[in-house]
Regions:
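Conserved, structured core segments of small domains
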Residues: 1-117
Length: 117
């Protein structure tokens, strides 16, 4: 099985405008979907990400608050999945709850040792 990182890109304004009930609904949808992924053997891990972070760049290690302060999008969470191929993950990702609130999923294959040869 190959590993894939599923990044959840979310609209900052849209997410901040959700009511507490909508946020609870979103969380419950993610919990249910994660359960389905676990049952099928595809889920390795996953979690939400706090928008308050830092970025460190360059050889001088310049530190800035928040990785994308000027962006309208943020990476709000991730799922680490395993599957036979990327096509399987694409089909799984189509059911990700973040799409219900206008989010985008990005699939990135995790490199294996043989990929470096």
């Amino acid at each position: 099985m190959k590993k894939f990182l599923l990044l959840l890109h979310e609209d900052v304004e849209k997410m901040s405008s959700l009511s507490p009930k909508e946020m609870e609904s979103l969380l419950n949808a993610h919990m249910a979907w994660a359960g389905k992924l676990a049952e099928s053997g595809h889920l390795i891990s996953g979690d939400g990400l706090n928008e308050n972070g830092v970025s460190i760049s360059g050889k001088d290690c310049i530190i800035k608050d928040g990785p994308y302060l000027e962006s309208k999008e943020m990476i709000g969470g991730y799922y680490l999945l395993q599957a036979a191929d990327q096509e399987t993950v694409v089909e799984l990702a189509k059911e990700c709850p973040c799409h219900l609130w206008g989010g985008t999923t990005e699939i990135r294959p995790i490199m294996e040792m043989e990929d470096y040869e």
